[in-house]
Amino acid sequence: MTMFSTGPRWRSAVADTFALVVYCFVIGMAIEVVISGMTFRQSLSSRLLSIPVNILIAWPYGMYRDAFIRFAQRHAGQRFWARNLADLLAYVSFQSPVYAMILWSVGADFEQMISAVASNAVVSMVMGVAYGYFLEYCRRLFRVAGYV
């Protein structure tokens, strides 16, 4: 493989995209319907709109997250809590603004948006970390080499 081969990068992009689309569809719908009080139709519209958005942001988010993980490793070593905190901070800081725009575009009112984004941020204390593990699982599944 040459120095400028795009193979590993494409594999990483596909793995990151698959992980984000699947994870956000399932978790997002649960949050929107069960916690935020959105109708099933509103949530389905939101989730369907989120697919192309997630396709666009998945790989940049994967690189953003990896930068948080590398920072945590540099400053706290391989500590379990540091990696989980990095996953949490990366997920909430990147995904919350994107999520708010998706909700706004499908007609969620201000109260629903605040409720959904705030609930997502709270739930992300667990789910952002869980997404990090799911992302790493998908990267292994797609045989991505050299990720954090």
Swiss-Prot record:
GO cellular component, one term: plasma membrane
Segments passing through the bilayer: 18-38, 49-69, 88-108, 114-134
Membrane topology reported for the UniProt record: Multi-pass membrane protein
Keyword Cell membrane carried by entry: yes
Annotated keywords: Amino-acid transport, Cell inner membrane, Cell membrane, Membrane, Transmembrane, Transmembrane helix, Transport
Record localization: Cell inner membrane
Superkingdom field: Bacteria
Xref: InterPro entries: Ala_export_AlaE
Molecular-function GO terms, alphabetical: L-amino acid efflux transmembrane transporter activity
BP term (GO), one: amino acid export across plasma membrane
Function field: Exports L-alanine.
Listed HAMAP family: L_Ala_exporter
Family: Belongs to the AlaE exporter family.
Descriptive protein name: L-alanine exporter AlaE
Species of origin: Yersinia pestis
Gene for this chain: alaE
